[in-house]
């Protein structure tokens, strides 16, 4: 190219580029070329640059291409790699982007010079109408064909009392209800297409684009066709791939196009709206059904927790009101009863004898949770969990109808082969469905990986149990230290009634256990992902199911093992004075206090549950906030106006494919705390309720402000988590029955009340004395007797054994067997009663409500009728056209024949 006078070659190229991008109104200010002198040419170049700069500044926060018309549906980012494989990555990108263009997608690249860090390229992707309609048909996306004549569900009676909780109708139902049908290009006239630009929601658009990206090839390497954006992301060919948020979350859109992100932030992600219902339809429209159904489940679970929390709070208040009048605590606190009972030492040698009334306050606290209401609450929660799951099935069925998921088929991305599986496969096999050859891995090749996986899982479980044993050893070893220290320190005597050695050990052990749990969680997440990867699952769905099972098993053992120990093992295999059981022949087994072990289980459960919730909420809220602040601080060097929309989203945290996985896992673990051991802690549902109320808003705030927009995906249920919840519901019936029988003191009190009490006016009078056996101090072995000699002849301990003057001294007496029989009877009766109710309720409550069945039938009927009428009218039009053409041809032939006769 010959250089123009006064301009360099670069300036000429730049001028041509700008002329192509400027509009007619903008170029009207330019001096005509035939009148240009060198200074005027430079003025034109300056003006072009200034106009383009202003346009660039104006469009930096835009979600459109430079033309301001084509919407950005997806963004890819990358940096040039100067290493030896940089050329290979560049070639992959060229091939990939070329193939994307062949599918019909529009691409526009932002040069690295326009980015904040000066090294990142951004590829903006737009799906034109033809691409959208083609893949909408491929994916079977349902779109509206007619306004529905089925009325929306009405609020129940007395709903006006919940006016403050309800959202405005325009927010709750942002769009009308329609009859829908699977989209078809050949029936476009059937669908309610008012504007092609807004017909497909942004969530549907990014879902279609991601489907294309996940199946687009980028070359052939080592004789294998390489496919999909995920493989390119794994190899760092691209840094990221994400759909754009609608706009800024703190201000509405300046255009007529609604800013759904702002609407969500305003009506959902505000912490001041914690008492409001959630805008589920807005969530679904913006994030897709998969994320939407998670928030529906979390909201429903929180609503149901309200009933459990109220009943649990009532049981706690009952325990609080009856605490002072409790006969057992009264006898323990009485100086003439509990003050005269000398208890055997709680550890060997260093521990001294002690009086029963020193545990007065401890016994009162124990009564808060160990009272008659415990049995009622255990039965109630067994029925509550059944109602929760059965009504969730109905809620899920209603959701399937409202969100057009009735004929849902699993997402293609979930059923697509994983790149890692394809890379490891050397064999191929005919797919009986698609009739195509697919990569196949024989079972004999999988067995070694399954063995490695099974071994690792077993080792992980053993490590978890060993950590629990280590904490148990800590509790055993530190108990004697606490006991001797509190006994010897005169300054601690005043607090000894409040802070007993048992309580000190329980608190310190629970706090240590909570810390260990949180640390092990971090490692087991990595281990579970590594093990699952080693198994080489075939599809993404198989990968998620396998990972879910492993993570749940690890978390189950990690969080609940210590609670199972306190509930079912502590104090059950202690022995008796003179014949105690020892762990590793060193540490004496832990004993329960005179009021039982239930208060220790409550302490353990409270610390772990609340500690986990506090840590989880702080981590969820502050981690993305700090990370995003740091990334923005490093990246942004110009004013906010020049910080482009795609760069703003690029600097947000990645939600990832497993984002929902961790949310479900956290909810299921919390569900376990609220059901498995709820008989020991009736306030657990209340704490879970408070956590969820704020947790919903934290999750909403994260998704709308701190994370990149996730790719929309469909789901019609919560998947494998529903089976896990059903399993935990069944286990919870057994655990609560065992807690009431073996951990609480209710059954022994009832046995004494009905079978052994001799006081008709106060049947529980004398229960404390009856529950403590007598031991002759002279029978202590030398290595266990306290160093400090006392004048006592006997001491008491918690068990049902014969006294030292009996011929079967220290053997279990008949009352022990009566109590044991009563405990087993209670377990059998409670389990059968609860399971009977469970099966009866499951039978009475249909999985799909009757009105939903009728609505589904109505919609199917109307859809078939509308399509039938459309096809019939189309056929008539075609027949009319064909008939007209035939008649026209007949008339022409007749006219020609008449002309021929006239000529003859």
Swiss-Prot record:
Topology Extracellular: residue spans: 312-371, 475-502, 570-667, 745-825
Bilayer-crossing regions: 291-311, 372-392, 454-474, 503-523, 549-569, 668-688, 724-744, 826-846
Keyword Endoplasmic reticulum: yes
Keyword Endoplasmic reticulum tagged: yes
Chain ranges on the Cytoplasmic side, renumbered to this chain: 1-290, 393-453, 524-548, 689-723, 847-904
Biological processes, Gene Ontology terms: plasma membrane repair
One Gene Ontology term of the molecular function aspect: protein dimerization activity
Tissues in which the protein is found: Highly expressed in skeletal muscle, bone tissues and thyroid gland.
Glycan-modified residues: 326, 357, 371, 759, 769, 782
Subcellular location as annotated: Endoplasmic reticulum membrane; Cell membrane
Induction remark: Up-regulated during the course of myogenic differentiation. Down-regulated during osteoblastic differentiation.
Entry keyword set: Cell membrane, Endoplasmic reticulum, Glycoprotein, Membrane, Transmembrane, Transmembrane helix
Family membership noted in the UniProt record: Belongs to the anoctamin family.
Described purpose of this protein according to its UniProt entry: Plays a role in plasma membrane repair in a process involving annexins. Does not exhibit calcium-activated chloride channel (CaCC) activity.
Remarks, miscellaneous: The term 'anoctamin' was coined because these channels are anion selective and have eight (OCT) transmembrane segments. There is some dissatisfaction in the field with the Ano nomenclature because it is not certain that all the members of this family are anion channels or have the 8-transmembrane topology.
Protein's name according to its UniProt entry: Anoctamin-5
């Amino acid at each position: 190219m010959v250089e123009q006078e006064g301009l360099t070659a670069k300036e000429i190229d730049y001028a041509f580029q700008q002329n192509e991008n400027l509009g007619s109104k903008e170029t009207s200010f330019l001096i005509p070329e035939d009148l240009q002198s060198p200074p005027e040419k430079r003025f034109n170049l300056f003006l072009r640059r200034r106009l383009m700069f202003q346009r660039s500044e104006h469009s930096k926060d835009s979600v459109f291409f430079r033309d301001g018309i084509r919407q950005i549906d997806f963004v890819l980012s990358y940096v040039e790699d100067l290493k030896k494989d940089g050329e290979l990555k560049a070639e992959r990108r060229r091939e990939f982007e070329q193939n994307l263009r062949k599918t019909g997608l529009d691409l526009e690249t932002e040069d690295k010079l326009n980015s904040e860090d000066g090294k990142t390229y951004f590829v903006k992707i737009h799906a034109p109408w033809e691409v959208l309609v083609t893949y909408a048909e491929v994916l079977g996306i349902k779109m509206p064909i007619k306004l529905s004549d089925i009325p929306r569900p009405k609020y129940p009676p007395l709903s006006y009392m919940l006016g403050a909780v309800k959202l405005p109708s325009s927010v709750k139902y942002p769009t009308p209800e329609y009859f829908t049908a699977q989209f078809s290009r050949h029936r476009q006239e059937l669908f309610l297409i008012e504007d092609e630009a807004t017909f497909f929601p942004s969530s549907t658009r990014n879902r279609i684009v991601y489907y294309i990206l996940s199946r687009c090839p980028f070359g052939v390497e080592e004789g294998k066709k390489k496919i999909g954006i995920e493989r390119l992301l794994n190899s760092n060919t691209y840094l990221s791939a994400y759909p754009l948020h609608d706009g800024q979350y703190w201000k509405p859109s300046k255009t007529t196009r609604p800013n759904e992100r702002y609407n969500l932030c305003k009506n959902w992600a505000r912490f001041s709206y914690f008492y409001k219902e959630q805008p589920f339809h807005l969530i679904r429209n913006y994030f897709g059904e998969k994320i939407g159904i998670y928030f529906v489940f979390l909201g429903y679970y929180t609503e149901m927790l309200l009933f459990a929390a109220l009943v649990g709070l009532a049981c706690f208040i009952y325990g609080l009101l009856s605490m002072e009048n409790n006969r057992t605590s009264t006898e323990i606190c009485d100086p003439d009863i509990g003050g005269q009972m000398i208890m055997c030492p709680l550890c060997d040698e260093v521990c001294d004898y002690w009086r029963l009334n020193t545990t007065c306050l401890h016994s009162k606290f124990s009564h808060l949770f160990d009272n008659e209401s415990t049995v009622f609450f255990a039965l109630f929660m067994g029925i509550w969990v059944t109602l929760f799951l059965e009504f969730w099935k109905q809620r899920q069925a209603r959701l399937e109808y409202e969100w057009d998921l009735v004929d849902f088929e699993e997402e293609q991305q979930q059923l697509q082969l994983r790149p890692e599986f394809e890379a490891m496969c050397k064999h191929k096999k005919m797919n009986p469905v698609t009739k195509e050859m697919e990569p196949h891995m024989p079972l004999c090749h999988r067995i070694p990986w399954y063995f490695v996986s099974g071994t690792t899982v077993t080792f992980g479980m053993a490590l978890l149990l060993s950590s629990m044993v280590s904490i148990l050893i800590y509790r055993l070893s530190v108990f004697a230290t606490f006991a001797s220290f509190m006994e010897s320190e005169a300054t601690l005597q005043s607090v000894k009634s409040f802070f007993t050695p048992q309580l000190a050990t329980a608190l310190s052990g629970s706090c240590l256990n909570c810390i260990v749990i949180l640390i092990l969680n971090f490692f087991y997440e990595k281990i579970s992902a590594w093990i699952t990867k080693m198994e080489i699952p075939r599809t993404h769905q198989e990968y998620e199911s396998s990972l879910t099972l492993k993570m749940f098993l690890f978390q189950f053992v990690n969080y609940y093992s210590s609670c199972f120990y306190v509930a079912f093992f502590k104090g059950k295999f202690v022995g008796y004075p003179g014949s105690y059981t020892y762990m590793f022949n060193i540490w004496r087994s832990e004993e329960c206090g005179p009021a039982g072990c239930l208060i220790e289980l409550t302490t353990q459960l409270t610390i772990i549950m609340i500690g986990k919730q506090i840590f989880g909420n702080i981590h969820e809220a502050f981690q993305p906030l700090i990370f995003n602040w740091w990334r923005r601080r490093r990246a942004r060097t110009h004013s906010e106006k020049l910080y482009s929309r795609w760069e703003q989203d690029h600097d947000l945290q990645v939600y990832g494919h497993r984002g929902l996985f961790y949310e479900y896992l956290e909810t299921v673990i919390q569900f376990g705390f609220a059901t498995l051991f709820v008989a020991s802690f009736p306030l657990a549902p209340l704490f879970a309720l408070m956590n969820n109320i704020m947790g919903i808003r934290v999750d909403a705030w994260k998704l709308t402000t701190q994370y990149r927009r996730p790719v929309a995906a469909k789901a019609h249920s919560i998947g494998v988590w529903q089976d896990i919840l059903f399993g935990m519901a069944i286990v919870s019936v057994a655990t609560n029955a065992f807690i009431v029988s073996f951990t609480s003191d209710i059954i022994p009190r009832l046995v004494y009340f009905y079978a052994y009490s001799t006081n008709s006016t106060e049947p529980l009078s004398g229960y404390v004395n009856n529950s403590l056996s007598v031991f002759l101090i002279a029978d202590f072995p030398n290595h266990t007797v306290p160093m400090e000699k006392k004048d006592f002849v006997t001491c008491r301990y918690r068990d049902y054994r014969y006294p030292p003057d009996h011929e079967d001294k220290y053997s279990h007496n008949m009352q022990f067997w009566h109590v044991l029989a009563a405990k087993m009877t209670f377990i059998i009766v409670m389990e059968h009663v609860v399971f009977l109710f469970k099966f009866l309720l499951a039978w009475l409550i249909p999985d799909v409500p009757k009105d939903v069945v009728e609505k589904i039938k109505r919609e199917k009927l109307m859809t078939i009728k509308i399509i039938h009428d459309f096809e019939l009218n189309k056929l008539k039009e075609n027949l009319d056209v064909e008939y007209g053409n035939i008649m026209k041809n007949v008339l022409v032939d007749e006219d020609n024949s008449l002309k021929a006769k006239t000529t003859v």
